[in-house]
Amino acid sequence: MDLIFDPAIPVKIEKMKQRVQWKHQSIVQRGIDQTSMVIDDGKEDSEEFSFMVIGDSGTTCQYEHHPQREVAKLMLQHRPECRFVLHTGDVIYTVGSREYYPSNFIKPYREFLKGGENPQNIAYDNMVFDTPILTTLGNHDYYDVPLKYRAITGPTLKLRRMFRYHDFEIGWFGSEQGDAYAKAFLDYLARFNQQEKLESHLDEHYTGKTDSGRCLRYEPGHFTRLPNRYYTFRYGGIDFFALDSNTINDPSPIPATPQGDIRRKALIQRRDEIDIEEQQILEEYDKLNLDNPKDAEKSDTLEAILSQLNEIKVDIE
């Protein structure tokens, strides 16, 4: 049961280039470095400052509690003296779907957002941070759902189980090759369908200056977009680098040798074993009464196991 898959590295790179209009003539003419930014909060030159680091924040609400809300509450204790938050990836589980941004990110971290007192009114692609949360892409932010599972319908038990599994945290859209993340956090320049609008935007928001030229000016509470899927900035005399490691390491193919054949057969066997494990878990899950607290808690455990099994299958493939 292949519920998730990871797009090819060349696809990830090309799609992200299109979204930020990489090397567009209007950008090149202005000498803009699309991999740099400055944080304009009036304090960026101070030598003493603190920041927080989080990651893997994308889990959803579980029985009677929301893990990310509990994390956010702890972070709020340090927010007054904190300049920004670094996010190390996996913003949304399991496949970076836009439909989970309200419940898994906007609502639990609402105090960090402008207008956070009414999180239901904040669109995932229109977030502005009062306290910067500077993100990077995790593998889950690139994952997708096969098209056949978006269109398939039917009354069979197998399909009902699959639909219930989708209801966990997979959704029906996937990340669309990282598009949801890009619209949520990046300066999505592809949205401008007229060059004069693009140039006006560049002249307004790309006024920062670094040794490499002009760059995006990140202004908390006003304009809080990131320039690219990877970027750098300097704060308090320290250089920070955010990388997209999803596009760096492409595993070598298994060689066409006797040893390679053994390895390939072992992986196929492991994949078949995972299919059996998934089916057994779904059968167990189908017997649970989610109105029962003990069963609801057990469902959380089964959901986590299913997610891990799907990640292993993605790695195998």
Q: Can you name each region flagged by the protein language model?
A:
Residues M1-F84, E99, S103, K107-T136, ...:
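Acidic, histidine-bearing metal-coordination/catalytic regions of metal-dependent phosphoesterases
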Residues I92-Y93:
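A short, conserved beta-strand element in the Rossmann-like catalytic core
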Residues L302-E317:
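Short, intrinsically disordered, charge-balanced linker/junction segments flanking boundaries
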